[in-house]
């Protein structure tokens, strides 16, 4: 997993609580796909935080960009929105994620993007990458009001150019509109199904990409399932993934011992010395390796704890584990033995992992 140090190119204020950061990455270019995300690491008031943010730019853009919306109680999102202009350099790893646009499908069929709030970021990247096609993409977007809609001006321009169809749901109580595709209030299953049947020509052949708050995403999915849309045509990315279901794998109920190779820093004569350490730790049944390592005092970088950010990766050299979620890992990483510690449950007593 590649690491980058990028500088701030410019900051654009999208709404009162949302900014887009454009990075100067000319010296350290990244290869990514529309829909993928980055991990950002910041030291905020002495606390090291790592968070994941989707790229809202496309690979052909001169400057890669992320769009950050303030989240209630979110330390990093609030800090970025308030202080982005004062951040000169950014520690970045990535790209991550398998929530990507299938360009062949976009060239041949209509694509429907279903967004809520800051979930527009990866979908906006997909939208910009579609380009000219005989099938006009459709965006279904739930927001509070036009003033609080991220990318409002850009989306309005695309709609005026007839390169994009949009149906909004505006949830602010004071919102009133006579436009057919500006719906006051929250989407309902009935309204969503009506919108899709009205605006999508071949609903069963169309592919649907969904991103936003969990409850809204589930509503979108339920509406599509109710229209008999094939499961393989529904693509989703949860910003806050739910905990892995531990009922789907069996264990013998025994505590397993795991060998962990890791690295520790120590000061010697005012200089940092790094030492390779090997620890034998006990892992309880249905206990993730990440939790067990922290219990045994092993320093492990982590963030999401649900397999979506990729921060807590390690290399498994022997043994068998159960890894229910691995959204952050491409197939080639899994084949190479890379695991996510927050999602790694040892099934045998010969598991060995190495922290990088």
Segment roles from a protein language model:
Residues 235-295, 311-316, 344-356:
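Redox cofactor-anchoring modules in respiratory/redox and cofactor-processing assemblies
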Residues 79-262, 267:
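FNR/FR-type flavoprotein reductase catalytic core
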Residues 59-63, 104-107, 346-356:
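Ligand-binding loop in jelly-roll beta-barrel domains
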Residues 1, 7, 226, 231, ...:
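Iron-sulfur (Fe-S) cluster-binding modules
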Residues 2-89, 93, 109, 143-145, ...:
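Ferredoxin-reductase
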Residues 131-138, 319-328:
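Phosphate-handling active-site elements
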């Amino acid at each position: 997993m590649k690491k980058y140090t990028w500088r701030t190119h410019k900051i654009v204020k999208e709404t009162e609580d949302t900014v887009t950061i454009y990075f100067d990455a000319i010296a350290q270019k990244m290869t990514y796909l529309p829909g993928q995300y980055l991990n950002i690491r910041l030291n905020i008031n002495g606390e090291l935080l790592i968070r994941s943010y989707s790229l809202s730019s496309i690979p052909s853009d001169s400057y890669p960009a992320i769009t950050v919306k303030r989240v209630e109680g979110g330390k990093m999102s609030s800090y970025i929105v308030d202080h982005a202009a004062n951040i000169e350099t950014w520690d970045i790893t990535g790209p991550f994620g398998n929530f990507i646009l299938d360009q062949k499908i976009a060239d041949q069929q209509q694509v429907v993007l279903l967004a809520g709030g800051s979930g527009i970021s990866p979908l906006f990247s997909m939208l910009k990458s579609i380009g000219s096609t005989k099938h006009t993409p459709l965006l279904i977007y739930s927001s509070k009001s036009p003033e609080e809609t991220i990318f409002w001006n850009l989306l309005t321009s695309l709609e005026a150019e007839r390169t994009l169809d949009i149906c909004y749901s505006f949830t602010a109580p004071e919102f009133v509109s006579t436009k057919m595709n500006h719906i006051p209030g929250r989407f309902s299953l009935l309204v969503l199904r009506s919108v899709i049947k009205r605006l999508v020509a071949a609903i069963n052949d169309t592919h649907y990409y969904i991103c936003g708050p969990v409850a809204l995403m589930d509503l979108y999915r339920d509406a599509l399932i109710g229209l008999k849309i094939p499961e393989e045509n529904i693509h989703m990315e949860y910003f806050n993934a739910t905990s892995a279901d531990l009922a789907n794998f069996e264990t013998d109920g025994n505590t397993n011992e795991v060998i962990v190779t890791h690295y520790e820093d120590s000061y010697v004569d005012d200089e940092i010395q790094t030492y390779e350490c090997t620890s034998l730790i006990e892992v309880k049944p249905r206990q993730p390796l990440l939790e067990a390592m922290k219990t045994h005092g092993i320093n492990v970088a982590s963030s999401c704890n649900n397999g979506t950010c990729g921060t807590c990766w390690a290399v498994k050299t022997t043994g068998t584990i159960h890894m229910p979620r691995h959204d952050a890992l491409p197939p080639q990483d899994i084949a190479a033995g890379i695991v996510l510690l927050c999602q790694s449950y040892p099934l045998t007593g010969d598991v060995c992992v190495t922290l990088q």
